[in-house]
Regions:
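N-terminal secretory signal peptides
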Residues: 1-2
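Histidine-acidic metal/acid-base catalytic patches
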Residues: 5-17, 27-31, 39, 43-50, ...
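Active-site acidic/histidine proton-transfer and metal-coordination neighborhood
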Residues: 12-23, 97-191
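Mobile, glycine- and charge-enriched loop segments
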Residues: 26-35, 75, 79
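Hydrophobic faces of well-ordered beta-strands that scaffold small-molecule active sites
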Residues: 29-35, 57-59, 85-90, 122-124, ...
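Acidic-and-aromatic substrate-binding clefts and catalytic sites of carbohydrate-active enzymes
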Residues: 36-43, 60-71, 93-103, 130-134, ...
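Acidic (Asp/Glu)-rich catalytic clusters
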Residues: 46-51, 68-87, 106-118, 148-156, ...
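Short, basic, helix/turn surface patches
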Residues: 83-93, 111-120, 151, 190-197, ...
């Protein structure tokens, strides 16, 4: 009878442990947080992101003008908070031949700034998509080619260029992203997969993690409410929300990151507070708690 009780107890314990989230995530990849939610109040963002327990931060190009001649001041703020600059939003890429030289120089300048801040990666986006436009294959290839040129230059500085997929840009749909990625030279530019933009564009971000594992440099971890509650009559409406508050299967994304043994940075991003009643810190706390409770990430 005693042996049976011990067996049942051990069996129940095994079942409980088996049903728990994996506790190995922290050893595989690193979590950062983007300052974009603070709307340009970057010094506040640095303090509050650190207070949430994150060790990495993404800053934007708006920090370049005020700190380009004194990067040591911004780096001192990062160092004091115990934060590493893990990604820098370097802005748009132009493909017009008359603008290519300037666009390359812009990102080279940002790469030098990033290096001075102790970082080693920049994010490239674009504003090339016109209303109701579907870019041609040749246009998407041209974008990849220019990004290859940028990446070649920044790599000389020790800074990795990454392509960020995005709604309302060239690279909105999974098919467009695929064309771009196929023509990227991984030795020069790699992929920063935004899971919510990829989802909203019609893709499965968890599958994209597997598909692009060889070129996956980093990710934006975010969630999206789609359609917006109260706007169901417009199926294309959407807004970005805190982790766990939207429709992206984030747990599966993390499972697949574990499957491919991903060791890079997964950066939590929320473009703005989803409600005027919330603060960036409150939103960050919600997302931090999701990561702690759902994937057992240890902050």
């Amino acid at each position: 009878m005693m042996n049976r009780r011990i067996f049942l107890k051990n069996s129940s314990l095994f079942a409980l442990v088996a049903g728990m989230p994996s506790l190995t995530f922290k050893q595989k990849f690193k979590l950062g947080y983007s300052a974009i939610t603070w709307g340009g109040k970057d010094l506040v963002a640095i303090e509050e992101i650190a207070s949430l327990g994150f060790k990495g931060i993404q800053l934007r190009a708006n920090t370049y003008a005020p700190f380009k001649d004194k990067p040591e001041e911004l780096k001192a703020a990062l160092d004091k908070a115990g934060l590493q600059l893990v990604m820098f939003s370097s802005g748009n890429v132009e493909v017009d031949p008359s603008k290519v030289e300037a666009t390359i120089q812009q990102h080279v300048n940002h790469a030098k700034f990033v290096k001075a801040l102790g970082g080693n990666a920049i994010q490239l986006t674009n504003s090339l998509r016109k209303k109701d436009q579907i870019p041609t294959e040749q246009e998407l290839i041209r974008l990849a080619e220019v990004m290859n040129e940028i990446g070649a230059k920044t790599k000389e500085l020790g800074v990795q260029a990454t392509y960020h997929n995005h709604m309302s840009q060239w690279g909105e749909t999974p098919e467009e992203v695929d064309t771009i990625v196929k023509h990227m030279d991984p030795s020069k530019i790699q992929l920063e997969l935004d899971v919510a933009h990829y989802f909203q564009g019609g893709g499965d971000p968890a599958e994209a993690v597997l598909k692009y594992k060889k070129v996956l440099h980093s990710l934006h971890i975010k969630d999206v409410e789609s359609p917006i509650i109260g706007q169901e009559s417009n199926p294309k409406s959407y807004k970005f929300v805190e982790l766990g508050e939207g429709k992206v299967n984030l747990v599966q994304v993390f499972k697949n990151l574990e499957k491919i043994n991903f060791k890079g940075w997964a950066i939590v991003e929320l473009d703005g507070v989803p409600s005027p009643t919330k603060t960036p810190l409150q939103c960050g706390t919600t997302s931090r708690n999701f990561l702690r409770d759902k994937i057992s990430y240890q902050f």
